């Protein structure tokens, strides 16, 4: 019934299996991939005919994690998987980025990749396996695809690079780098690092590239056995339409790209585009070319004009040379009620970044296949349409916004203080108010400034820069701080963020073959110079964290209580902790290890809550004086509640100096008194005294008498 084909190999000490022919046989391509005991199913389907009226490749990648893969039932009311999680969105982008450039130019057929995680061993992250399975499914599908693609993860543990570290090993790693590419070229890099050098980062990229070569070989072997007949792809002759567009537009387009202001340049380019449309689509005659072909030819001519100017003249769209960073203005403290704020402007790109500090209650609960965990650092990136002078959809963030936010999150996170050093939940919001390239890196710069403005003790400020590359044969040019046009007209887009000490985040997307290790080294070195320049400009606004937290930020103090006392502090049904919160006004968060965080904007509120918690969790000390309340008066003395829920007896002989006839002559129920803890009797009952305490001042009279006696002897 099944015609199953399988390839197996040992990859970084674990078995990788690629199988096709048993599951999802009606898809154009389907591969079941297993690494360790993690299994994913990748399927790909592409329409047989192009989608009319579009000038882009309609590729959709959907990565989905099923809770059953880890033996879990989803949370929530409906108990089933819902909208994509942040990780699912990020992995979908991770798969999309290296495969998209490998489809033929002009391919307009609707194409959908669906990757489903079926089993997760909690040791091998499914993301790399998902990328490998997708590549294999495309390679055997018969769909036009210039692959296969391989992928690998590289860590840096105990001073050595490690291929495909496990989930646990990654927790100890100073690097989390994912690299993807073909047999002879790197196409994509995504990473987070703890201030590593450019040299080490490049070495990690090349280690990953070498590491996935056996996987590419295995995919090729699978395709030799199981690949479908390749589809025929009609290759359009573009020479005639390109010549027609060039004759009409080249001269004026060159002039348009001498205009340095973005909006004015766009107007000039639109005017040239309108001229082409008028010439090639006359109202009184049948057009020679389709609108899609003319639009494609015009875009290609735009790219050529920009590239010629850069390679031949060394001049960029806005008039800069290759290495110059646009003018920078950094401002902090611009929002009066925010805990920390910054406005970072670089040329025509601007980010308004706001830092907010919260308590443990504000931590985000993240539900994943590995289990539920809490995240104390959040970074949200928003890209409203007005930032590029357009109208558009507003609402929940799209994939691009989630991806850009995660890139900035990775860049800043290694510089944050630990939870023990700074027990706050931190949220960053970056509002992109203007954009002309590199808005995610503006978010990195603005985030550092806003955090320091809020008083967060960063190890060092972080800055980021977006770089580009133009490659024609043997000639190439590396561009610092690219514009939006240079991004989509160039051959490589990579973003580097870090401190003066090293790189904290690197993202790279390469669109063409031929970019060598040497070219990437030149680009990384040039990016370092740009990053250090930006850090210098940022230091003009703020060089380090403010000494005090923002005026409106909550204050948090921590204390440790014995774990066996947690239940007493919380009380039955939360009764005790609710009473503490209601009466002191402080927020209280108790961890399983006995760490208690008490937060309030009022210092007295924090002190009162801490004293209350200590009175419950700690044992009273002999010789200490406490304030208490008389709860019962009896013939032989009075019972006083003096330490949380603890009561003790003040014997009638200890109520006052001299003889006391009746206890009620000295104290009454409900009266506030000061008592000294004398100790405990044979049965563990508490013995208290009032006679040795000044009821007005709380002074220890016994200690005072002893001191006076000692002084007289001396």
UniProtKB/Swiss-Prot annotation:
Q: Which UniProt keywords apply?
A: Cytoplasm, Magnesium, Metal-binding, Nucleotidyltransferase, RNA-binding, Transferase
Q: What cofactors does the UniProt entry give for this protein? A: Mg(2+)
Instruction: Show the Pfam families listed in the entry.
Output: KH_1, PNPase, RNase_PH, RNase_PH_C, S1
Q: What class of enzyme is it?
A: transferase
Quote the Gene3D superfamilies the UniProt record gives: GHMP Kinase, N-terminal domain (3.30.230.70), K Homology domain, type 1 (3.30.1370.10), Nucleic acid-binding proteins (2.40.50.140)
Q: Which reactions is this enzyme annotated as catalysing?
A: RNA(n+1) + phosphate = RNA(n) + a ribonucleoside 5'-diphosphate
**Which function does this protein serve?**
Involved in mRNA degradation. Catalyzes the phosphorolysis of single-stranded polyribonucleotides processively in the 3'- to 5'-direction.
What name does the UniProt record give this protein?
Polyribonucleotide nucleotidyltransferase
Q: Which organism is it from?
A: Methylocella silvestris (strain DSM 15510 / CIP 108128 / LMG 27833 / NCIMB 13906 / BL2)
Source organism phylogeny: Bacteria, Pseudomonadati, Pseudomonadota, Alphaproteobacteria, Hyphomicrobiales
């Amino acid at each position: 019934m099944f015609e199953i084909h399988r390839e197996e190999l040992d990859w970084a000490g674990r078995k990788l299996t690629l199988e096709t022919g048993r599951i999802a046989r009606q898809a154009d391509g389907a591969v079941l991939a297993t690494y360790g005991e993690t299994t994913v199913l990748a399927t790909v389907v592409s329409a047989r005919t192009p989608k009319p009226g579009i000038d882009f490749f309609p590729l959709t990648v959907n990565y989905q994690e099923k809770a059953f893969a880890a033996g879990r039932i989803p949370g929530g009311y409906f108990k089933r998987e819902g909208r994509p999680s942040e990780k699912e969105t990020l992995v979908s982008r991770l798969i999309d980025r290296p495969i998209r450039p490998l489809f033929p130019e002009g391919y307009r057929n609707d194409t959908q990749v669906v990757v489903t995680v079926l089993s997760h061993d909690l040791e091998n992250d499914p993301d790399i396996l998902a990328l490998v399975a997708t590549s294999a499914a495309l390679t055997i599908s018969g769909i036009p695809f210039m692959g296969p693609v391989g992928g690998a993860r590289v860590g840096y543990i105990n001073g050595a690079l490690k291929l495909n570290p496990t989930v646990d090993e990654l927790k100890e790693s100073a690097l989390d780098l994912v690299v993807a590419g073909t047999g002879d070229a790197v196409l994509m890099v995504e990473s987070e690092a703890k201030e590593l050098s450019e040299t080490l980062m490049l070495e990690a990229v090349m280690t990953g590239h070498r590491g996935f070569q056996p996987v590419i070989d295995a995919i090729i072997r699978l395709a030799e056995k199981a690949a479908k007949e390749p589809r025929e792809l009609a290759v359009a002759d573009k020479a005639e339409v390109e010549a027609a567009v060039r004759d009409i537009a080249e001269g004026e387009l060159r002039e348009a790209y001498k205009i340095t202001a973005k909006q004015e340049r766009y107007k000039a380019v639109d005017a040239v585009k309108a001229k082409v449309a008028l010439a090639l689509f006359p109202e009184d005659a049948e057009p020679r070319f389709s609108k899609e072909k003319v639009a494609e030819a015009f875009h290609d001519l735009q790219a050529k004009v920009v590239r010629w100017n850069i390679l031949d003249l060394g001049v960029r769209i806005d008039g800069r040379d290759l290495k110059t960073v646009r003018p920078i203005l950094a401002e902090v403290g611009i929002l009066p009620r925010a805990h920390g704020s910054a406005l970072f402007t670089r040329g025509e790109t601007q980010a308004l970044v706001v830092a907010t500090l919260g308590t443990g209650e504000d931590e985000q609960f993240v539900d994943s296949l590995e289990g539920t965990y809490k995240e104390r650092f959040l970074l949200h990136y928003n890209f409203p349409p007005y930032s590029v002078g357009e109208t558009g959809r507003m609402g929940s963030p799209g994939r691009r916004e989630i991806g850009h936010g995660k890139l900035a999150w990775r860049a800043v996170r290694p510089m944050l203080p630990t939870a023990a050093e700074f027990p706050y939940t931190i949220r960053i919001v970056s509002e992109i108010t203007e954009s002309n390239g590199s808005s995610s890196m503006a978010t990195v710069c603005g985030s550092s400034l806003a955090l320091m403005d809020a008083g967060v003790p960063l190890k060092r400020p972080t800055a980021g820069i977006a770089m580009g590359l133009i490659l024609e044969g043997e000639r190439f040019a590396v561009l610092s701080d690219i514009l939006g046009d240079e991004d989509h007209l160039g051959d490589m887009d990579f973003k580097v963020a870090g401190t003066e000490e090293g790189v904290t985040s690197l993202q790279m997307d390469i669109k063409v073959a031929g970019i060598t290790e040497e070219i990437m080294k030149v680009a990384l070195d040039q990016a370092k110079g740009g990053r250090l320049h930006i850090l210098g400009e940022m230091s003009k606004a703020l060089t380090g964290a403010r000494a005090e937290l923002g005026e409106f930020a909550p204050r948090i103090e921590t204390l440790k209580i014995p774990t066996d006392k947690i239940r007493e502090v919380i009380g039955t049904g939360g009764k005790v902790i609710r009473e503490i919160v209601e009466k002191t006004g402080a927020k209280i968060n108790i961890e399983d290890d006995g760490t208690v965080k008490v937060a309030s904007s009022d210092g007295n509120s924090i002190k009162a809550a801490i004293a209350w918690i200590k009175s419950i969790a700690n044992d009273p000390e002999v010789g200490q004086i406490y304030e208490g309340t008389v709860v019962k008066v009896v013939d032989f003395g009075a019972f006083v509640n003096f330490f949380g829920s603890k009561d003790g007896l003040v014997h009638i002989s200890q109520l006052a100096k001299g003889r006391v006839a009746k206890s009620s002559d000295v104290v009454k129920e409900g009266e506030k008194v000061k008592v000294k803890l004398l100790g405990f009797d044979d049965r563990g009952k508490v013995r208290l005294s009032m006679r040795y305490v000044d009821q007005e001042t709380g002074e220890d009279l016994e200690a005072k008498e002893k001191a006076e006696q000692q002084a007289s002897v001396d």
